[in-house]
Amino acid sequence: MATPTQTPTKAPEEPDPFYYDYNTVQTVGMTLATILFLLGILIVISKKVKCRKADSRSESPTCKSCKSELPSSAPGGGGV
């Protein structure tokens, strides 16, 4: 029985390019989704507020496009 004179050396392993830290990926994804969700709500709210301010001051082209969305500006005295 022969014994090896040298200990076998391991070849240097390259890191797997398809290894993902799924916890970090999930955290970043949820953070981005939350930011985009809140940004979308902020944009929708800001357009409604902008339209109401413009409607109370004077007739403007931007508000004319919003008039159909606002219940208080319905023809015939609308309102609630």
From Swiss-Prot:
Q: Which residues lie on this side of the membrane: Extracellular?
A: 1-23
User: Where are the glycosylation sites?
Assistant: T3, T5, T9
Q: What is known of its domains?
A: The transmembrane domain is important for the interaction with NKA and with the functional effect of FXYD7.
Its name, as the record gives it, is FXYD domain-containing ion transport regulator 7
Topological domain (Cytoplasmic) residues are 47-80
According to the record, the residues making up region (Disordered) are 54-80
Family of the protein in this entry: Belongs to the FXYD family.
What is known about what this protein does?
Answer: Associates with and regulates the activity of the sodium/potassium-transporting ATPase (NKA) which catalyzes the hydrolysis of ATP coupled with the exchange of Na(+) and K(+) ions across the plasma membrane. Reduces the apparent affinity for external K(+), an effect that depends on the presence of external Na(+) and voltage. Increases the apparent affinity for intracellular Na(+).
Chain segments annotated as coiled-coil in the UniProt record = none
MF term (GO), any: sodium channel regulator activity
Q: Which residues carry this modification: Phosphoserine?
A: S73
Q: How does it assemble?
A: Regulatory subunit of the sodium/potassium-transporting ATPase which is composed of a catalytic alpha subunit, a non-catalytic beta subunit and a FXYD regulatory unit that modulates the enzymatic activity in a tissue- and isoform-specific way by changing affinities of the Na+/K+-ATPase toward Na(+), K(+) or ATP.
PTMs?
O-glycosylated; required for stabilization and translocation to the plasma membrane.
Q: Which Gene3D superfamilies does the annotation name?
A: Single helix bin
Topology within the bilayer: Single-pass type I membrane protein
Gene Ontology biological-process annotations: positive regulation of sodium ion export across plasma membrane; potassium ion transport; sodium ion transport
Q: Name the GO cellular-component terms.
A: plasma membrane
Q: Which domain of life is it from?
A: Eukaryota
Its localization reads: Cell membrane
Q: Cross-referenced InterPro entries, in alphabetical order?
A: FXYD7 (IPR047284), FXYD_motif (IPR047297), Ion-transport_regulator_FXYD (IPR000272)
State the organism's lineage: Eukaryota, Metazoa, Chordata, Craniata, Vertebrata
Q: What residue intervals traverse the membrane?
A: 24-46
